């Protein structure tokens, strides 16, 4: 039903379990990466539903752990943040287009304007019609940004969920 590219930041806690189930269904893995498990999970769900957005939402019911995703299909760019909000993800505007990044400083680097953070559990779709959100998974879990985000992973010039990393 089409092709997609996937970028992933994070770690799954149930990757081995998902991988085993997917292999029993005929999936052949080429890496040991969580990213490949996520891609197969979305692809597997896509066979059952009518849109990639529905497939991503269904996959979120199965994927557990810390993740932010950016998925590119021929017609859409889709950004996803895990329901806990463990990993940051933000939206930017560059000319007439939309960009997504794990840190706001990446937007600065390309001259994009920060728009907002992706909410925990939110699926954001950018296409010819503009920007829209699916919030089915929002508010399902307590908010839990990874403790290492501010002190180890993020650059000091980033802003995550409204807080400057340097002063947090």
Predicted regions and their residues:
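Conserved short alpha-helical segments that host acidic/polar catalytic motifs at enzyme active sites
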Residues: 1-120, 125-168
């Amino acid at each position: 039903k089409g092709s997609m590219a996937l970028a992933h930041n994070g770690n799954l806690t149930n990757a081995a379990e998902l991988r085993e189930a997917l292999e029993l269904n005929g999936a052949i893995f080429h890496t040991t990466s969580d990213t490949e498990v996520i891609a197969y999970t979305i692809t597997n769900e896509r066979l059952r539903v009518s849109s990639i957005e529905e497939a991503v939402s269904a996959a979120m019911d199965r994927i557990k752990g810390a993740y932010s995703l950016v998925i590119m299909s021929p017609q859409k760019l889709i950004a996803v943040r895990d329901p806990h909000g463990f990993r940051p993800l933000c939206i930017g505007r560059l000319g007439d287009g939309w960009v997504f990044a794990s840190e706001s400083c990446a937007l600065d680097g390309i001259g994009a304007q920060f728009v907002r953070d992706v909410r925990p559990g939110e699926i954001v779709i950018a296409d010819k019609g503009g920007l829209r959100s699916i919030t089915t998974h929002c508010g399902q879990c307590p908010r839990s940004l990874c403790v290492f985000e501010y002190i180890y992973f993020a650059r000091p010039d980033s802003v995550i969920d409204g807080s400057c990393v340097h002063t947090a």
